[in-house]
């Protein structure tokens, strides 16, 4: 896994103010994350902290600029839970993967954001946000055949979570 430098000043960043929730669902990939994560307890702490659209946008922009990847298009949906989200691959990534696999390129590729996208609820837990940022980092840094919820992704999830947690203490 390619390691990214994670040291950056917080100067000029406005304060992130999450609110706390007490209960969270069991996650689908919980066992893998728990067994591979370098700081599973940090992830669990982030799962109890919720932010709205403005803070989520600020966090995503900061993490992406810090790690040197493009900022994804953010799509907020009122009906999406704070615990669920989805990441769309960048358009060029889909085209490159299709070409490498000898597949026809779908006409639907043209609607994909060039930088990728993340779909979130109007409020989102910081663990969910870190989870999706982990996918976004994989899409921009790692080979296209990197498993969606494999060990490399858990490492990117941890990297994003470390930056997010650092913002809270800034």
Task: Show which residues each predicted segment covers.
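Active-site-proximal or metal-binding-adjacent scaffold patches in catalytic folds
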Residues: 1-127, 136-170
């Amino acid at each position: 896994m390619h390691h990214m430098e994670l040291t950056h000043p917080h100067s000029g960043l406005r304060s992130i103010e999450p609110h706390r929730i007490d209960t969270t669902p069991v996650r689908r990939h919980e066992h893998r994350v728990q067994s591979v994560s370098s700081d599973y307890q940090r992830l669990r702490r982030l799962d109890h902290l919720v932010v709205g659209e403005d803070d989520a946008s600020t966090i995503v922009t900061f993490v992406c600029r810090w790690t040197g990847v493009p900022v994804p298009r953010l799509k907020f949906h009122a009906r999406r839970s704070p615990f669920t989200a989805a990441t769309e691959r960048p358009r060029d990534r889909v085209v490159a993967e299709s070409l490498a696999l000898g597949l026809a390129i779908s006409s639907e590729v043209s609607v994909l954001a060039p930088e990728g996208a993340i779909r979130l609820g109007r409020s989102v837990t910081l663990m969910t946000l870190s989870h999706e940022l982990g996918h976004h980092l994989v899409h921009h840094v790692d080979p296209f055949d990197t498993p969606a919820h494999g060990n490399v992704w858990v490492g990117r999830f941890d990297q994003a979570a470390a930056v997010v947690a650092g913002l809270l203490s800034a």
